[in-house]
Amino acid sequence: MGQKINPIGLRLGINRTWDSRWFAGKQEYGKLLHEDVKIREILHKELKQAAVARIVIERPHKKCRVTIHSARPGVVIGKKGADIDKLRKRVADITSSDVVINIVEIRKPELDATLVAESIAQQLERRVAFRRAMKRAVQSAMRLGAEGIRINCSGRLGGAEIARMEWYREGRVPLHTLRADIDYGVATAFTTFGTCGVKVWIFKGEILEHDPMAQDKRMAEGETGGGGDRGGRQRRDNAAV
C-alpha cells in the first residue's frame, strides 16, 4: 500500500533512481556494499553541521565518485578546501581507489524532506514546542511552492507520560500515485524524555515522463512544482494504549 511503503523505494526505476550507482559481480558486491555504508556513516558523522540530505556514490573503473547534496557547501569545503581534502583521504582509505568528491548545493532546504525532518528533530531537542515546529515547517514548504506536505511526530511529545503520534498535513500528498514526485525523510530527536521520531512527506508535483533520472534532473533545474489545490490543514492525535 502506498501509505505504508517508503515512497522513494516504491518509485525507484519510475521517476527516482538509486543513491548507489554501480554494478559488481557476486564476489565483490558485498564488499562494495559495506564500503558504501561506511562512507555514508563517516560523512554524516563528520558533516553534522553541513545539512547533508543525500550522498550519491558512483564507481567508474577503479574510481569512486561521491556526490554530497548539502544546504551548506561552504561547511563541507572548509577553509581553502582543507576539510574536503581530509574527507577525500578518509574515503580513499576505505575504498583503496581514486576518490572524487563533488558537492551539490540545495538551494531550497525547506523543500527537502530529509533536511526538514532533521530541522524539526533539532528543535525538539532544544525543547521547542512540537506543534510550533511542525506548523512552521509546513508553512515554509507551502510558501516556497510545495503542492502538499505531511509531517508525523511520534514519541513522548512535550514530555507526556504516554507516547503518542501527531501529524499535520496541508495540500495533497498522493502516496498511491506513482508519477507523483514525493520526497520522504526521517529523523530521530534524542530528548531527555526519550527518542521522538519525525517523518516528512513533501509532494512537489507530477513527473509525466517515465525516466528514473527525472527527479535528479528536476532538482538540478531548480523546479519545485506549482502551487496546486492546498486544501485545509489537518491535525490528528492518536493516544497510544
From Swiss-Prot:
Family matches, as NCBIfam families: rpsC_bact
Pfam families reported in the protein's UniProt record: KH_2, Ribosomal_S3_C
Protein function: Binds the lower part of the 30S subunit head. Binds mRNA in the 70S ribosome, positioning it for translation.
Gene3D superfamilies the record matches: 3.30.300.20, Ribosomal protein S3, C-terminal domain
Domain KH type-2: 39-107
Compositionally skewed regions (Basic and acidic residues) per UniProt: 230-241
Entries under CDD domains matching the protein: KH-II_30S_S3
Family: Belongs to the universal ribosomal protein uS3 family.
GO biological process: translation
Region Disordered, annotated ranges: 217-241
Segments traversing the membrane: none
UniProt keyword terms in alphabetical order: Ribonucleoprotein, Ribosomal protein, RNA-binding, rRNA-binding
Assembly: Part of the 30S ribosomal subunit. Forms a tight complex with proteins S10 and S14.
Domain of life of the native organism: Bacteria
Keyword Transmembrane tagged: no
Stored InterPro entries: KH_dom, KH_dom-like_a/b, KH_dom_type_2, KH_sf_prok-type, Ribosomal_S3_C_sf, Ribosomal_uS3_bac-typ, Ribosomal_uS3_C, Ribosomal_uS3_CS
Species of provenance: Bradyrhizobium diazoefficiens (strain JCM 10833 / BCRC 13528 / IAM 13628 / NBRC 14792 / USDA 110)
Name listed for the protein in its UniProt record: Small ribosomal subunit protein uS3
GO molecular function, one term: rRNA binding
GO CC list: cytosolic small ribosomal subunit
